[in-house]
Every structure is written in structure tokens, then in C-alpha cells.
């Protein structure tokens, strides 16, 4: 059962990231003729396309894709907590999972951008889209940071902010997990340290 739950939650999270990429690319006004952008659009169009005819966009935000991402997080929350009936806490957990997924997506985009800057050196179409995605987030930080002799520390600052936010979200997710089913929230955290684990078993 745990293996199936892990597989389902992983597949849902990966697809949620692809949907969020679509929202992010529209917000950042990325080149949608780029091969990578076309992949994201084609992968999400079967679900997002029909909703876009009903739900209008909110300025640069693709509200239909954002709604799909939230629904996927609701499903993931139900899978993680193994709850059949809808409880109010599920919606809170889904929102927190959505925020956590957004943070993870930003982190992986920054990491891939850093790796590809060494490997492809600007020749890859994927790197071009990653730079377009990251620029709206990094530009305000660059404006605040003083000049560091040509070294860009804005990605490090953003990763640090994401880490702090992720820690806070993880704490709240643990609390909501314990409210739903005692002990379930612990699955969302890191395992106990060996010394602590040993003391627990000794008791």
C-alpha cells in the first residue's frame, strides 16, 4: 500500500510541476515556439485546454492551469492522508502542497539552469526557457543586492528563501497530518536521527 501511495503521489507531483511550468511560462512570457515550451503545452493541453474555454485568464496568470494544479494537489492530499471523505483540512493541506510543489519547481529550475550554463553554455533551447522563467524572480533580488564584481548571488539568495519557506510549510503540513490521522504527518518529514531513533526503540 505504501509503495502504491508513493508512486501515485510522485506521478501527481511531477504532472503538477509540468502544469505549473505552463503557468510560469505564460507569466514570464517565455517563447512558446521553443521545443521545450511546446512539450509543456502538449503535455498539459488535454486537461487544461477544455478548462481554458470556461475559465478566463487573470491577466498574465493562466487561471485554468492554476486550478488544475490545485485539484491535483487536492488529489495528492487525499492519497497521502488516505482519507475518503472530504474534510476541511484536506483543502488546507492541498494548498500547502501546492505551495511546496511551486517551491520545489523553482529550485529544480534554478539547479538545471546552473548545470546547463556549464554544459551547453547558452546553446540549448531548454536553457533559454529556464533563463526566461528565472529572470522575473531573480531580477528584484539583483536590484537589491550590491555589485559583487560580476558574480551573481541572486540564485543563492532565492534558494535560501525557498529553504526557509519550505521548512515553514513542512511544519504546517506535519500539523495538518497529525490532525487528520495521528502519525500520518510524520511521513512528510525527514526520518529521525539515529540517536533519537535508538532512544525511541529503547523505550
Functional labels for PLM-detected ranges:
Residues 1-203:
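Selective transmembrane helix interface/packing segments
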Amino acid at each position: 500500500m505504501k509503495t502504491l501511495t508513493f508512486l501515485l503521489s510522485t506521478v501527481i507531483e511531477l504532472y503538477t510541476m509540468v502544469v505549473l511550468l505552463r503557468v510560469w511560462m505564460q507569466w514570464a512570457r517565455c517563447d512558446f515556439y521553443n521545443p521545450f515550451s511546446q512539450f509543456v503545452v502538449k503535455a498539459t493541453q488535454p486537461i487544461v485546454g477544455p478548462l481554458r474555454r470556461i475559465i478566463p485568464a487573470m491577466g498574465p496568470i493562466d487561471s485554468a492551469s492554476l486550478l488544475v494544479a490545485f485539484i491535483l494537489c487536492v488529489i495528492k492530499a487525499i492519497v497521502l492522508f488516505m482519507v475518503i471523505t472530504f474534510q476541511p483540512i484536506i483543502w488546507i493541506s492541498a494548498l500547502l502542497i501546492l505551495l511546496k510543489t511551486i517551491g520545489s519547481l523553482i529550485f529544480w529550475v534554478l539547479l538545471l539552469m546552473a548545470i546547463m550554463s556549464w554544459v551547453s553554455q547558452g546553446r540549448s533551447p531548454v536553457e533559454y526557457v529556464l533563463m526566461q522563467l528565472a529572470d522575473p524572480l531573480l531580477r528584484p533580488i539583483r536590484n537589491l543586492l550590491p555589485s559583487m564584481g560580476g558574480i551573481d548571488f541572486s540564485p543563492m539568495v532565492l534558494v535560501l528563501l525557498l529553504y526557509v519557506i519550505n521548512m515553514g510549510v513542512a511544519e504546517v503540513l506535519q500539523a495538518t497530518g497529525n490532525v487528520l490521522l495521528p502519525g500520518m504527518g510524520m511521513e512528510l518529514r525527514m526520518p529521525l536521527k539515529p540517536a533519537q531513533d535508538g532512544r525511541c526503540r529503547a523505550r
